[in-house]
Regions:
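Conserved hydrophobic beta-strands of the Rossmann-like cofactor-binding core
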Residues: 9-13, 89-94
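Active-site loop/turn elements of alpha/beta-hydrolase fold enzymes
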Residues: 41, 66, 148
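Rossmann-fold cofactor-recognition segment
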Residues: 54-70
Length: 179
């Protein structure tokens, strides 16, 4: 490859299996010379194949629930201990119980909506807040979140995830102002 990310260090959230966008991003980052920590929620780590990706990319796996400030604090402390300041963060996290359970948008379960909102969008704010408070980003570093066109248009089967992605994009704009 080209070594575009040689010497760059970061955290990649959300790789579950080889069908995950975060998985493919991690592979490319590794091919381009980056070093990173892989992270996902403990339950997702049990269901997924993240250890295989870690072995393939010579990366460390640190479980963290991205909705937990305590977990994020520990993850970022470990990243700082390993790398010093970091150059990139990828937030590739999303989940809707309403979609999984086949609930129609006009009949969504609000407790599930709240959970999906926290996982899919608010966690991005929590990740950036933790990075901000720990002053762990190198100058000109990048923080990325994956979104979907349903944040801008209606896709009925995407259900409340469209709402979640809209809020994710709003968080990116609002917190991005301060970086």
């Amino acid at each position: 490859m080209y070594g575009l990310l040689k010497g760059k260090k970061g955290i990649i959230f959300g790789a579950l299996n080889d069908q995950s966008i975060a998985w493919k991003v991690a592979e490319r980052c590794h091919e381009e010379g980056a070093e990173f920590i892989l992270s996902n929620a403990p339950i997702a780590m049990r269901m997924g194949e993240i250890d295989a990706l870690a072995q393939k990319t010579n990366s460390e796996v640190i479980g963290a629930d991205a909705t937990s400030m305590e977990d994020l604090g520990k993850l970022f402390d470990a990243a700082i201990a390993k790398f010093g300041k970091i150059d990139f963060i990828l937030h590739s996290i999303g989940m809707s119980v309403n979609v999984r359970k086949g609930k129609h948008y006009t009949d969504i379960n609000y407790d599930w909506l709240e959970k999906g909102w926290d996982v899919s969008a608010v966690s991005f704010h929590k990740v950036m807040k933790t990075a901000w408070e720990k002053d762990c980003m190198n100058e000109w570093g990048s923080i990325l979140a994956l979104t979907y066109i349903a944040a801008q248009r209606t896709f009925p089967d995407y259900n409340d995830m469209g709402d979640n992605k809209s809020y994710l994009e709003s968080i990116a704009r609002s917190f991005g102002y301060y970086w």
